[in-house]
Amino acid sequence: MTVVLCIDDTGGMMFNHRRQSRDRYVYADMAKEEFDVLRMDEYSLPLFSEEKVRIECSKDFLSDAQEGDICFVEDRDIFPYLNKINRVIIYRWNRRYPWDVDFKIDLKAEGFAIKTVNEFSGYSHEKITKEIYER
């Protein structure tokens, strides 16, 4: 499975039970990836209202994920699921935000290698960096 995360310059993901930021161009870019099902928590569903993709929501979406699925993760640790993950896509906001939930995993130490890095202009962000890691 593929996991997708959005983080700031310090690895922050959320603050006070809310996402740090959002950008509609990130979600449109994510929808262009090849996958069977886009899985997420219901909290994330409104972000994808304009995307024409198969979406399944559940509290246990990382456990439910199958090979070929993409999981959009905003608020939880993916470490318990590392054995199922073969690809990680990180969108970097290139800004610093307050955070109390962050991404702590050293992907290189876990056997991932960076495959591509692309930058694009977002809808509300001057620059977004997309990094794809694979093992």
Residue ranges and their predicted role:
Residues 1-135:
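Enzymes that bind and transform nitrogen-containing heteroaromatic metabolites
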